[in-house]
């Protein structure tokens, strides 16, 4: 098994709630709030794929995408300029397929031995599909919440058990995942020391610090 496969398996596990996860044959990933995806990644960039090459480095091979980095949101200390993104060539091993010279993507991934690896269990989305709040989150809010814990709720009852948790209930909605909290909210530590959901178009300040919506 290639290094890419070993790396991705660590972040990709089977989930019995198949209708709220992202299936791709043998690859099934647990839902992840965009803030968690941001905070748990070594690299977060906005980039356009400009080329690809199948690397013969294992039984299934690895796809190497050449990217033009537009902006980096996380990973300056790891790799300030990303040129290549690696992923499993097989979708059954959580490999992701990206269009060449077509879209700009938000890409998250991990760095291993000087290379950036990503896959279906990482957050990868076409840039134009991100909400305004998600784009703001990348620039300002998500980094403020990396010490908070987003606790998913799959069925009722569910509760927070510590002051650093935000209860994530998108999976209970009839609209499914990703839902309203994923698209519009960030879980941010407040000045009183607890974490709560924050929604707004400006960084938190004393006039909004006590918001607990939703």
Curated annotation (Swiss-Prot):
Keyword set, alphabetical order: Disulfide bond, Extracellular matrix, Metal-binding, Metalloenzyme inhibitor, Metalloprotease inhibitor, Protease inhibitor, Secreted, Signal, Zinc
Annotated Gene Ontology cellular component terms: extracellular matrix; extracellular space
UniProt keyword Signal present: yes
Main location: secreted
Transmembrane segments: none
Residues under site feature: Involved in metalloproteinase-binding: 40
Domain NTR stretches: 27-146
Signal peptide extent: 1-26
InterPro entries, alphabetized: Netrin_domain (IPR001134), TIMP (IPR001820), TIMP-like_OB-fold (IPR008993), TIMP_C (IPR027465), TIMP_CS (IPR030490)
Region feature (Involved in metalloproteinase-binding): 27-30, 91-92
Disulfide pattern: 27-94, 29-121, 39-146, 148-195, 153-158, 166-187
Binding residue positions for Zn(2+): 27
Compartments it resides in: Secreted, Extracellular space, Extracellular matrix
Biological process terms in GO annotation: negative regulation of membrane protein ectodomain proteolysis; response to cytokine; response to hormone
Family of this protein: Belongs to the protease inhibitor I35 (TIMP) family.
Entry function: Complexes with metalloproteinases (such as collagenases) and irreversibly inactivates them by binding to their catalytic zinc cofactor. May form part of a tissue-specific acute response to remodeling stimuli.
Name used for this protein in its record: Metalloproteinase inhibitor 3
Naturally occurring in which organism (per UniProt): Xenopus laevis (African clawed frog)
